[in-house]
Amino acid sequence: MPGKELSDPCVDCRDAEAILTLRRRRLCKDCYIKFVSYKVFKRMENYRLNRGFAKDKPCKLLFPLSYGLSSSVLLHMLHDQLEVQRSKVHGSPGFDLHVLIIEPSTISPSNPAHDEGFELAQKCFPLCSFTKVPFHSIFALVPDIKETMSQFAGKGFEDDPSLSDAERLNAFRSCIATSTSKADVDHILMNRLIVAFAKQMDCQAIIWGDSDSRLAAKTLANVAKGRGSSVIWQVSDGMSPFGLEFNFPLRDLFTAELRDYASFFPELTKLIVPDEPLPANTLTKNLSIDELMMRYVLTQGEKYPGVMLNVTRTANKLDVSQMPANLSHCTFCAAPLMNEVGGGHTQFCYACARSRPSTSS
């Protein structure tokens, strides 16, 4: 008996109706998931096969989860890989994944605590281990950060040891003047917290959940802010200045493609906290450079996805080995100091100097 004729067959399997267009190809649900997941599968190959790591034990990886679309989708894909890895009796040790969550409400009071998301993640991804920490735990994880903050803020900030860690962190953050500087400083502090936690857990690498769209925006924003030298490790796979590998498995996938993937899984819909859309009438001067670049990439990326993909691919070709040896590094962000002149007891890179309260504008 002949099978039912399909009006719009999937171009890959030819056995099911196509429901989505992926890069000009009409695919069914299963083939769409397979295509998107394979992009991440290939990017995780070195960790799955323990290339460059001990062969007798799993490679320990840290994964920061923000409850955003990209990191939530990536966690779902990585857990699928863990399930396959554990099902193989004689396979390589592969990797273990520890998930770190910085409590959203401690980053901004406008962010929901999302405690139900933490419980849901533990339930949906049982092969991962989880830790949740507040933003101000940076003081415990990075012991010298208090002195660094005081030097960074200069005379415009006076640390009060009688305050709680949360209050001290908020006091420091509130002395940063502009929206761009605030976003820049917050990103650096969160990055240092995550790196310090990864080292405490004896992890070999950090897996970041940035999509191609996010990496393109990050590249453009970093160059605009004067952080061109840090693009190498902020958007490229490889060794970071912190002695840990950074890896971005979603670099070949667009935000829109991740959104379609998430729509197939109800648990992801419950886990993801959607980004609040910026009002169309928001004044440009009230936006940070990071927000401006993300808005630009999301709007132009829909029209010219290939251009945004080239931005990320070009940045990924930067070779950290071509950097001059024996460079000193910025005390605040760890970027290599090229031509900067240090002052006082420490040195800050050009971009950090611009973000300091005494110089930001």
From Swiss-Prot:
Location relative to the cell: Cytoplasm
Database matches in Pfam families: CTU2 (PF10288)
Keywords of this entry: Cytoplasm, tRNA processing
Pathway: tRNA modification; 5-methoxycarbonylmethyl-2-thiouridine-tRNA biosynthesis
Family to which this protein belongs: Belongs to the CTU2/NCS2 family.
HAMAP family associated with the record: CTU2
Record-given protein name: Cytoplasmic tRNA 2-thiolation protein 2
Top-level taxonomy: Eukaryota, Fungi, Dikarya, Ascomycota, Pezizomycotina
Gene: ncs2
